[in-house]
């Protein structure tokens, strides 16, 4: 698997970067990749089918100049920004392997990530804490969420990407997001302030844990610039896409 640690200048380009990796692999010009990125400024990302007005405090975002974008994968709405580390996995779909179906891929990827991050944090937590996969694709620490994840599939490859809250300003979530319309049972109607936590590891520790877990030891120098420009122009810079629901 190849490794790319690259943050692009804008939110639109970073979302397009994940999708471009998937498109490149599907076209036969790429393969399995682990990418990291972290936005230097806050923005809101809604899941593909989310309704912006139902999930986002649109007026507050507008007043503060915080962009609202839509990603190509499912899942819920999140706030991005400094202290929120993003990863993206491009994996080959094989019918007889754990990537063969949506549910199998969710279980396989989430458990591998859980084990890797729990191991990285174990030496720092006294007393020991419980790391679990909860909901469909959440990672929790003692029942508090620190990672949300989503999947997008093509015929030959899938994109599985997510966030890791490390030293993020969690107050932004309550300011910018409404209570989600769909909630996992384990949330138990808790508000954002009582539902989220940070993973107590450094960026380098989190990255190293996932790099080792996925054996991403072959460097990838760059993202496909032409495809990114096309995706930004066609989708991620357009209100027709970002506010389609």
Model features per residue range: what roles?
Residues 1-100:
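N-terminal lobe of the biotin/lipoate ligase/transferase fold
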Residues 39-41, 132-136:
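Short Gly/Ser/Thr- and Asp/Glu-enriched loop/turn motifs at secondary-structure junctions
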Residues 104-131, 147-245:
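Long, positively charged amphipathic alpha-helical accessory segments at protein N-termini or as interdomain linkers
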Residues 138-141:
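Glycine- and Gly-Pro-enriched alpha-helical subdomains that act as flexible
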């Amino acid at each position: 698997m190849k490794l790319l640690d690259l943050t692009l200048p804008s939110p639109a380009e970073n979302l397009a970067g994940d999708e471009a990796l998937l498109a490149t692999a599907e076209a036969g010009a790429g393969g399995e990749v682990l990418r990291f990125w972290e936005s230097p400024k806050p923005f809101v990302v809604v899941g593909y089918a989310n309704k912006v007005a139902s999930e986002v405090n649109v007026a507050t975002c507008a007043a503060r100049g915080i962009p609202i974008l839509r990603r190509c994968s499912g899942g819920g709405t999140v706030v991005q920004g400094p202290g929120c580390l993003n990863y993206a996995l491009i994996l080959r779909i094989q019918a007889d392997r754990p990537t063969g179906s949506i549910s199998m891929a969710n279980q396989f990827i989430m458990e591998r990530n859980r084990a890797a991050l729990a191991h990285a944090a174990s030496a720092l937590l006294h007393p020991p804490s419980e790391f679990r996969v909860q909901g469909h694709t959440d990672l929790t620490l003692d029942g508090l969420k620190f990672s949300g994840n989503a999947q997008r599939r093509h015929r030959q490859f899938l994109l599985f990407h997510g966030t890791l809250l490390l030293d993020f300003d969690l107050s932004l979530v309550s300011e910018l997001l409404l209570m989600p319309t769909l909630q996992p049972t384990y949330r138990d109607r808790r508000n954002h302030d009582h539902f989220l936590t940070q993973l107590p590891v450094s960026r380098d520790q989190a990255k190293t844990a996932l790099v080792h877990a996925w054996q991403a030891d072959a460097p990838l120098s760059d993202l496909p610039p032409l495809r990114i420009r096309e995706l930004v122009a066609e989708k991620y810079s357009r209100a027709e896409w970002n506010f389609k629901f």
